[in-house]
Amino acid sequence: TAEAKFIRALSHYHVVRIWALPYGYTSDNSHLGIPLKVSADQTPQMRATVADVYAQIEQDLLDAEADLPASNGIFANQMAAKALLAKVYLEMGDFANAKAKAAEVMNSGTYSLDPVLTNRFADHANGNLPAEFIFTLVSTNESSATDTIVDERGMSFTWNYRSDDPNANPALKASQALYVEATADTNDLRGQLWYEARNAGTPDEFYVVSKFDGSFLDVPLLHLSDLYLIYAECNVRLNGDSDGSGLAKINALRQRAGLTDLTSLTLTDVMSERRLELAFEGDRLFQLKRQGILGEIQTIRGVDWDCPGMVLQFPNFEGT
């Protein structure tokens, strides 16, 4: 039951962020979210409010946190529930609880930051996962499709990024702005190892992403790098990072990327590191919308951050 509640919370969390405006869009979160699926009943349901959706997600995760085992192989464990709670609380603007849950996982001694930057999306031999992975969709190199688990993006996600063919022109590419930011510091391994300019210096120049060139990618839905970023942001927002503990987390990520340490930490620093560290992991849009809720940005690519185009529309046959 605890594993099922964790998966239900994870599913509701991903879906509500795609199909509804963010938490905080209305003062009481009475704006429409998604139909809540809490039973096997196939009867179409009306959309619940975002407040109700997040309340269900939080309760499912608190139940899972209490009942999941400390160790559970490749399946969800107690720390996975805590890690997802940290992400949910960050989305809700509950920075104190987000920081606390991130700290519980980081201080558990169960996980450690992988010293090799590229290991997060390398080929892992049948479940031999990096020490920073908290909850992962595991893929194998077996020929049977039933032996391979993929996330909601499916194989088309990684194949539309692949850059390991020199003649490749993938469907999904980096923007010029991101490429420039990622490669601005020539010591940054993220820029060196994850991007390549093709047709450089010509009008047809474009930028491929090499982050997902592995054949059997394990998809790290929850990992320690993200929690470092959550902790650092929350500490800045709560107390200006007065104790320097957020700075230490950001510098750990920077050191792994080959960069020198920062001497102080601002919110801009944290969000910049998040963009570079989690690029193309399905994170950026939701962070921008979260910053829109907080009044820190007004537009995304020239349009209002909360315009209808920033959420997917429900099909006509769905109860709305």
Where are these regions (language model features)?
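Aromatic-anchored glycine-rich loop motif in surface-exposed flexible loops
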Residues: 1-71, 245
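Alpha-helical solenoid scaffolds that mediate protein-protein interactions
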Residues: 15-16, 64, 71, 105-113, ...
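TPR-repeat structural position
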Residues: 54, 95, 241-243
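Hydrophobic-face positions in mid-chain alpha helices that act as interaction patches
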Residues: 99-224, 267, 277, 281-282, ...
